[in-house]
Protein backbone atom coordinates (compact mmCIF):
# COMPACT_ATOMS: atom_id res chain seq x y z
CA UNK A 1 0.00 0.00 0.00
CA UNK A 2 1.32 3.44 -0.92
CA UNK A 3 0.49 6.80 0.62
CA UNK A 4 -0.06 9.91 -1.58
CA UNK A 5 2.78 12.41 -1.33
CA UNK A 6 0.31 15.34 -1.35
CA UNK A 7 -2.93 15.55 0.63
CA UNK A 8 -6.06 14.63 -1.31
CA UNK A 9 -9.27 16.66 -1.31
CA UNK A 10 -12.85 16.03 -2.38
CA UNK A 11 -12.16 18.24 -5.41
CA UNK A 12 -9.28 15.92 -6.40
CA UNK A 13 -11.86 13.13 -6.46
CA UNK A 14 -14.05 15.12 -8.85
CA UNK A 15 -16.53 16.76 -6.48
CA UNK A 16 -16.35 20.57 -6.38
CA UNK A 17 -18.19 21.89 -3.31
CA UNK A 18 -17.44 25.47 -4.32
CA UNK A 19 -19.19 24.91 -7.66
CA UNK A 20 -22.23 23.62 -5.80
CA UNK A 21 -22.27 26.71 -3.60
CA UNK A 22 -21.97 28.93 -6.68
CA UNK A 23 -25.01 27.19 -8.17
CA UNK A 24 -27.06 27.84 -5.04
CA UNK A 25 -26.17 31.54 -5.17
CA UNK A 26 -27.08 31.70 -8.86
CA UNK A 27 -30.57 30.28 -8.39
CA UNK A 28 -31.68 32.03 -5.19
CA UNK A 29 -33.56 34.85 -6.90
CA UNK A 30 -35.31 32.46 -9.31
CA UNK A 31 -36.36 30.18 -6.46
CA UNK A 32 -37.66 33.14 -4.46
CA UNK A 33 -40.15 33.91 -7.26
CA UNK A 34 -41.86 30.57 -6.63
CA UNK A 35 -42.52 31.07 -2.93
CA UNK A 36 -46.00 30.43 -1.55
CA UNK A 37 -47.31 31.78 1.78
CA UNK A 38 -47.50 28.25 3.19
CA UNK A 39 -43.74 27.70 2.86
CA UNK A 40 -41.81 27.88 6.13
CA UNK A 41 -38.09 28.62 6.31
CA UNK A 42 -35.60 29.19 3.53
CA UNK A 43 -33.74 27.16 0.91
CA UNK A 44 -30.90 25.03 2.23
CA UNK A 45 -32.34 23.34 5.30
CA UNK A 46 -32.17 19.60 5.90
CA UNK A 47 -35.89 19.34 5.27
CA UNK A 48 -38.30 21.74 3.59
CA UNK A 49 -41.44 22.73 5.48
CA UNK A 50 -44.83 23.63 4.04
CA UNK A 51 -48.16 24.16 5.79
CA UNK A 52 -51.44 23.07 4.24
CA UNK A 53 -53.54 25.95 2.87
CA UNK A 54 -56.20 26.89 5.42
CA UNK A 55 -59.02 26.96 2.84
CA UNK A 56 -59.21 23.15 2.74
CA UNK A 57 -61.63 21.48 5.18
CA UNK A 58 -60.55 17.90 4.48
CA UNK A 59 -57.30 18.14 2.52
CA UNK A 60 -55.91 15.13 0.69
CA UNK A 61 -52.31 15.21 -0.49
CA UNK A 62 -51.58 14.09 -4.05
CA UNK A 63 -48.01 13.29 -5.10
CA UNK A 64 -46.22 12.62 -8.35
CA UNK A 65 -42.73 12.06 -9.69
CA UNK A 66 -41.41 12.07 -13.23
CA UNK A 67 -38.49 12.93 -15.49
CA UNK A 68 -37.95 14.31 -18.96
CA UNK A 69 -36.86 11.07 -20.61
CA UNK A 70 -34.55 11.11 -23.61
CA UNK A 71 -35.62 14.62 -24.54
CA UNK A 72 -32.60 15.43 -22.36
CA UNK A 73 -30.34 13.78 -24.92
CA UNK A 74 -31.39 16.28 -27.58
CA UNK A 75 -31.20 19.19 -25.14
CA UNK A 76 -27.66 18.21 -24.13
CA UNK A 77 -26.49 17.52 -27.68
CA UNK A 78 -27.81 20.85 -28.98
CA UNK A 79 -26.94 22.81 -25.82
CA UNK A 80 -30.50 23.96 -25.20
CA UNK A 81 -30.92 23.68 -21.46
CA UNK A 82 -33.37 26.49 -20.69
CA UNK A 83 -36.61 24.59 -21.25
CA UNK A 84 -36.03 21.12 -19.81
CA UNK A 85 -36.69 22.47 -16.31
CA UNK A 86 -40.13 23.63 -17.42
CA UNK A 87 -40.68 20.16 -18.92
CA UNK A 88 -39.80 18.56 -15.60
CA UNK A 89 -42.34 20.56 -13.63
CA UNK A 90 -44.98 20.18 -16.33
CA UNK A 91 -44.78 16.40 -16.34
CA UNK A 92 -45.41 16.29 -12.59
CA UNK A 93 -47.88 19.14 -12.09
CA UNK A 94 -50.05 18.19 -15.09
CA UNK A 95 -50.41 14.72 -13.57
CA UNK A 96 -51.55 16.22 -10.26
CA UNK A 97 -54.23 18.47 -11.77
CA UNK A 98 -55.86 15.38 -13.32
CA UNK A 99 -57.06 14.51 -9.79
CA UNK A 100 -58.19 18.09 -9.22
CA UNK A 101 -55.17 18.83 -7.05
CA UNK A 102 -53.56 22.25 -6.67
CA UNK A 103 -49.75 21.82 -6.76
CA UNK A 104 -48.17 23.03 -3.51
CA UNK A 105 -44.46 22.36 -3.74
CA UNK A 106 -41.80 20.83 -5.95
CA UNK A 107 -38.37 19.29 -5.41
CA UNK A 108 -35.81 18.45 -8.07
CA UNK A 109 -32.91 16.03 -8.41
CA UNK A 110 -30.06 17.00 -10.75
CA UNK A 111 -27.27 14.44 -11.25
CA UNK A 112 -24.11 14.79 -13.31
CA UNK A 113 -20.54 13.56 -13.52
CA UNK A 114 -19.01 17.05 -13.38
CA UNK A 115 -21.08 20.04 -12.36
CA UNK A 116 -21.24 22.75 -15.01
CA UNK A 117 -22.57 25.70 -13.02
CA UNK A 118 -23.80 27.59 -16.08
CA UNK A 119 -25.76 24.61 -17.43
CA UNK A 120 -27.19 23.69 -14.04
CA UNK A 121 -28.22 27.30 -13.44
CA UNK A 122 -30.13 27.35 -16.74
CA UNK A 123 -31.87 24.09 -15.87
CA UNK A 124 -32.89 25.13 -12.36
CA UNK A 125 -34.08 28.53 -13.55
CA UNK A 126 -36.29 26.60 -15.98
CA UNK A 127 -37.59 24.53 -13.08
CA UNK A 128 -38.39 27.73 -11.20
CA UNK A 129 -40.23 29.10 -14.25
CA UNK A 130 -42.25 25.89 -14.43
CA UNK A 131 -43.13 26.28 -10.75
CA UNK A 132 -44.30 29.85 -11.36
CA UNK A 133 -46.50 28.62 -14.21
CA UNK A 134 -47.89 25.85 -11.96
CA UNK A 135 -48.29 28.04 -8.88
CA UNK A 136 -46.15 25.75 -6.72
CA UNK A 137 -43.10 26.50 -4.61
CA UNK A 138 -39.64 25.14 -5.38
CA UNK A 139 -38.77 24.31 -1.79
CA UNK A 140 -35.73 22.08 -2.17
CA UNK A 141 -33.71 19.72 -4.28
CA UNK A 142 -30.51 17.76 -4.64
CA UNK A 143 -27.56 18.44 -6.90
CA UNK A 144 -25.45 15.28 -7.11
CA UNK A 145 -21.98 15.50 -8.64
CA UNK A 146 -20.94 11.89 -9.18
CA UNK A 147 -17.69 11.42 -11.10
CA UNK A 148 -17.54 8.14 -12.98
CA UNK A 149 -21.32 7.76 -13.11
CA UNK A 150 -22.07 10.00 -16.10
CA UNK A 151 -20.13 10.55 -19.32
CA UNK A 152 -18.92 13.96 -20.47
CA UNK A 153 -21.51 16.72 -20.14
CA UNK A 154 -24.42 14.35 -19.48
CA UNK A 155 -26.86 14.99 -16.67
CA UNK A 156 -30.18 13.57 -15.55
CA UNK A 157 -33.25 15.09 -13.95
CA UNK A 158 -36.07 13.91 -11.73
CA UNK A 159 -38.87 15.93 -10.20
CA UNK A 160 -41.20 15.40 -7.27
CA UNK A 161 -44.42 17.37 -6.77
CA UNK A 162 -47.02 17.40 -3.99
CA UNK A 163 -50.46 18.97 -4.30
CA UNK A 164 -53.67 19.15 -2.32
CA UNK A 165 -57.33 18.58 -3.12
CA UNK A 166 -60.52 18.70 -1.06
CA UNK A 167 -61.51 15.09 -0.35
CA UNK A 168 -65.07 15.60 -1.62
CA UNK A 169 -63.75 17.16 -4.84
CA UNK A 170 -61.27 14.47 -5.93
CA UNK A 171 -61.65 13.72 -9.65
CA UNK A 172 -61.25 9.98 -10.24
CA UNK A 173 -63.37 9.28 -13.33
CA UNK A 174 -66.22 7.59 -11.47
CA UNK A 175 -68.69 10.28 -12.61
CA UNK A 176 -67.94 9.74 -16.32
CA UNK A 177 -71.07 8.61 -18.17
CA UNK A 178 -72.50 7.98 -21.61
CA UNK A 179 -73.13 11.30 -23.36
CA UNK A 180 -70.37 13.29 -21.67
CA UNK A 181 -68.44 15.61 -23.95
CA UNK A 182 -64.68 15.48 -24.45
CA UNK A 183 -62.75 18.73 -24.70
CA UNK A 184 -59.16 18.81 -25.93
CA UNK A 185 -56.50 21.28 -24.83
CA UNK A 186 -53.78 21.82 -27.41
CA UNK A 187 -50.22 20.72 -26.74
CA UNK A 188 -47.19 22.86 -27.52
CA UNK A 189 -45.48 20.00 -29.39
CA UNK A 190 -44.28 16.51 -28.47
CA UNK A 191 -43.98 17.67 -24.84
CA UNK A 192 -41.68 15.15 -23.08
CA UNK A 193 -42.73 11.83 -24.55
CA UNK A 194 -41.76 9.70 -27.53
CA UNK A 195 -38.24 11.08 -27.80
CA UNK A 196 -36.56 7.73 -28.27
CA UNK A 197 -38.67 7.34 -31.41
CA UNK A 198 -38.02 10.97 -32.38
CA UNK A 199 -34.27 10.42 -32.11
CA UNK A 200 -34.61 7.24 -34.19
CA UNK A 201 -36.47 9.19 -36.89
CA UNK A 202 -33.69 11.79 -36.92
CA UNK A 203 -31.13 8.98 -37.23
CA UNK A 204 -32.74 6.99 -40.05
CA UNK A 205 -33.88 10.03 -42.04
CA UNK A 206 -30.49 11.74 -41.63
CA UNK A 207 -32.46 14.97 -41.23
CA UNK A 208 -30.71 18.15 -40.16
CA UNK A 209 -32.36 19.29 -36.90
CA UNK A 210 -31.49 22.87 -37.87
CA UNK A 211 -33.63 22.71 -41.01
CA UNK A 212 -36.60 25.05 -41.24
CA UNK A 213 -40.07 23.67 -40.58
CA UNK A 214 -43.00 26.09 -40.74
CA UNK A 215 -40.80 29.08 -40.04
CA UNK A 216 -38.54 27.80 -37.27
CA UNK A 217 -35.82 25.17 -36.84
CA UNK A 218 -36.99 21.59 -36.47
CA UNK A 219 -35.03 21.26 -33.22
CA UNK A 220 -37.03 24.14 -31.72
CA UNK A 221 -40.29 22.37 -32.56
CA UNK A 222 -38.99 19.24 -30.85
CA UNK A 223 -37.65 20.99 -27.75
CA UNK A 224 -40.61 23.34 -27.26
CA UNK A 225 -41.36 23.24 -23.51
CA UNK A 226 -44.27 21.16 -22.29
CA UNK A 227 -47.48 23.13 -21.82
CA UNK A 228 -48.56 23.53 -18.20
CA UNK A 229 -52.34 23.43 -17.84
CA UNK A 230 -52.65 23.82 -14.07
CA UNK A 231 -53.91 27.38 -13.68
CA UNK A 232 -56.46 27.24 -16.50
CA UNK A 233 -57.82 23.89 -15.29
CA UNK A 234 -58.07 25.09 -11.69
CA UNK A 235 -60.22 27.93 -13.03
CA UNK A 236 -62.33 25.40 -14.93
CA UNK A 237 -62.79 23.31 -11.79
CA UNK A 238 -64.05 26.34 -9.88
CA UNK A 239 -66.97 26.78 -12.26
CA UNK A 240 -67.68 23.37 -13.82
CA UNK A 241 -68.42 19.83 -12.74
CA UNK A 242 -65.52 18.09 -14.46
CA UNK A 243 -65.95 14.31 -14.57
CA UNK A 244 -62.42 13.31 -15.63
CA UNK A 245 -59.17 14.58 -17.09
CA UNK A 246 -56.43 12.71 -18.91
CA UNK A 247 -52.87 13.98 -19.36
CA UNK A 248 -51.75 12.66 -22.77
CA UNK A 249 -48.19 11.47 -22.12
CA UNK A 250 -46.31 8.24 -22.87
CA UNK A 251 -48.70 5.78 -24.47
CA UNK A 252 -50.62 8.53 -26.23
CA UNK A 253 -54.39 8.34 -26.64
CA UNK A 254 -54.64 4.55 -26.41
CA UNK A 255 -52.99 4.24 -23.00
CA UNK A 256 -53.87 7.45 -21.15
CA UNK A 257 -57.56 8.07 -21.79
CA UNK A 258 -58.65 4.61 -20.50
CA UNK A 259 -56.88 5.31 -17.19
CA UNK A 260 -59.73 7.65 -16.18
CA UNK A 261 -62.73 5.82 -17.69
CA UNK A 262 -65.14 3.37 -16.04
CA UNK A 263 -65.06 -0.12 -17.57
CA UNK A 264 -68.45 0.36 -19.25
CA UNK A 265 -67.46 3.56 -21.07
CA UNK A 266 -65.36 4.39 -24.10
CA UNK A 267 -64.04 7.62 -25.56
CA UNK A 268 -65.04 8.39 -29.14
CA UNK A 269 -62.46 10.78 -30.61
CA UNK A 270 -63.17 12.62 -33.86
CA UNK A 271 -59.88 12.97 -35.71
CA UNK A 272 -61.31 15.58 -38.08
CA UNK A 273 -61.90 18.00 -35.18
CA UNK A 274 -58.30 19.23 -35.26
CA UNK A 275 -55.19 19.35 -37.42
CA UNK A 276 -51.95 17.86 -36.18
CA UNK A 277 -49.18 20.40 -35.63
CA UNK A 278 -46.62 20.22 -38.45
CA UNK A 279 -43.96 18.52 -36.33
CA UNK A 280 -46.13 15.39 -35.98
CA UNK A 281 -46.76 15.23 -39.71
CA UNK A 282 -43.01 15.56 -40.24
CA UNK A 283 -42.28 12.70 -37.83
CA UNK A 284 -44.94 10.46 -39.39
CA UNK A 285 -43.64 11.04 -42.92
CA UNK A 286 -39.91 10.89 -42.22
CA UNK A 287 -40.18 7.91 -39.91
CA UNK A 288 -42.76 6.03 -41.97
CA UNK A 289 -44.79 5.71 -38.77
CA UNK A 290 -48.33 4.31 -38.88
CA UNK A 291 -51.23 6.40 -37.64
CA UNK A 292 -51.88 3.84 -34.90
CA UNK A 293 -48.28 4.11 -33.71
CA UNK A 294 -48.47 7.91 -33.77
CA UNK A 295 -51.52 7.90 -31.49
CA UNK A 296 -49.86 5.29 -29.25
CA UNK A 297 -46.60 7.24 -28.89
CA UNK A 298 -47.32 10.97 -29.21
CA UNK A 299 -49.96 13.44 -28.09
CA UNK A 300 -50.50 14.47 -31.75
CA UNK A 301 -51.38 18.01 -30.69
CA UNK A 302 -53.58 17.17 -27.69
CA UNK A 303 -51.97 17.60 -24.29
CA UNK A 304 -55.02 17.17 -22.07
CA UNK A 305 -58.53 15.74 -22.49
CA UNK A 306 -61.40 16.82 -20.23
CA UNK A 307 -64.71 14.98 -19.80
CA UNK A 308 -67.72 16.98 -18.60
CA UNK A 309 -71.50 17.23 -19.15
CA UNK A 310 -72.35 17.97 -22.77
CA UNK A 311 -74.49 21.00 -21.88
CA UNK A 312 -71.44 22.71 -20.35
CA UNK A 313 -69.23 22.57 -23.44
CA UNK A 314 -69.80 26.11 -24.68
CA UNK A 315 -69.20 27.78 -21.32
CA UNK A 316 -66.15 25.58 -20.65
CA UNK A 317 -64.62 26.41 -24.02
CA UNK A 318 -65.28 30.11 -23.43
CA UNK A 319 -63.51 29.95 -20.06
CA UNK A 320 -60.53 27.99 -21.36
CA UNK A 321 -60.11 30.34 -24.31
CA UNK A 322 -60.17 33.32 -21.94
CA UNK A 323 -57.41 31.60 -19.94
CA UNK A 324 -55.25 31.40 -23.06
CA UNK A 325 -55.87 27.78 -24.02
CA UNK A 326 -56.54 26.52 -27.52
CA UNK A 327 -59.43 24.18 -26.72
CA UNK A 328 -62.10 22.43 -28.79
CA UNK A 329 -64.73 19.69 -28.71
CA UNK A 330 -62.87 16.52 -29.70
CA UNK A 331 -65.46 13.82 -29.06
CA UNK A 332 -67.76 12.19 -26.54
CA UNK A 333 -68.21 9.34 -24.10
CA UNK A 334 -70.28 6.36 -25.27
CA UNK A 335 -71.37 3.02 -23.84
CA UNK A 336 -68.77 0.28 -24.22
CA UNK A 337 -69.93 -3.15 -25.29
CA UNK A 338 -68.09 -6.29 -24.24
CA UNK A 339 -64.47 -6.33 -25.29
CA UNK A 340 -64.49 -3.07 -27.26
CA UNK A 341 -61.43 -0.87 -26.97
CA UNK A 342 -61.90 2.06 -24.60
CA UNK A 343 -60.71 4.55 -27.22
CA UNK A 344 -62.25 4.76 -30.67
CA UNK A 345 -60.68 7.23 -33.11
CA UNK A 346 -62.93 8.02 -36.06
From Swiss-Prot:
Its EC number is 6.3.3.1. Pathway: Purine metabolism; IMP biosynthesis via de novo pathway; 5-amino-1-(5-phospho-D-ribosyl)imidazole from N(2)-formyl-N(1)-(5-phospho-D-ribosyl)glycinamide: step 2/2. One of its GO terms (cellular component) is cytosol. It is an enzyme of class 6 (ligase). Keywords: ATP-binding, Cytoplasm, Ligase, Nucleotide-binding, Purine biosynthesis. InterPro entries: PurM-like_C_dom, PurM-like_C_sf, PurM-like_N, PurM-like_N_sf, PurM_cligase. GO terms for biological process: 'de novo' IMP biosynthetic process; adenine biosynthetic process. GO terms for molecular function: ATP binding; phosphoribosylamine-glycine ligase activity; phosphoribosylformylglycinamidine cyclo-ligase activity. It is found in: Cytoplasm. Its main location: cytoplasm. It catalyses: 2-formamido-N(1)-(5-O-phospho-beta-D-ribosyl)acetamidine + ATP = 5-amino-1-(5-phospho-beta-D-ribosyl)imidazole + ADP + phosphate + H(+). NCBIfam families: purM. Belongs to the AIR synthase family. PANTHER family: TRIFUNCTIONAL PURINE BIOSYNTHETIC PROTEIN ADENOSINE-3 (PTHR10520:SF12), TRIFUNCTIONAL PURINE BIOSYNTHETIC PROTEIN ADENOSINE-3-RELATED (PTHR10520). This is Phosphoribosylformylglycinamidine cyclo-ligase. The gene is purM.
Amino acid sequence: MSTPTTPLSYKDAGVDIDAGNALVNNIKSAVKRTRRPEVMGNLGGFGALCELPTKYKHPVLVSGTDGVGTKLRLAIDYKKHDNVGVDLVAMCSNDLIVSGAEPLFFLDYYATGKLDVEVATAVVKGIAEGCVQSGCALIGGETAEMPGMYEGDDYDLAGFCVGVVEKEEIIDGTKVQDGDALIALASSGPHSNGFSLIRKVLEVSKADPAQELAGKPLIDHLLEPTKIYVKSLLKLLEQHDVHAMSHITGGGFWENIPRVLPEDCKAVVKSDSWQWPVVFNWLMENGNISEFEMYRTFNCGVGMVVALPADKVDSALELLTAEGENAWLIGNIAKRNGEEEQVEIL
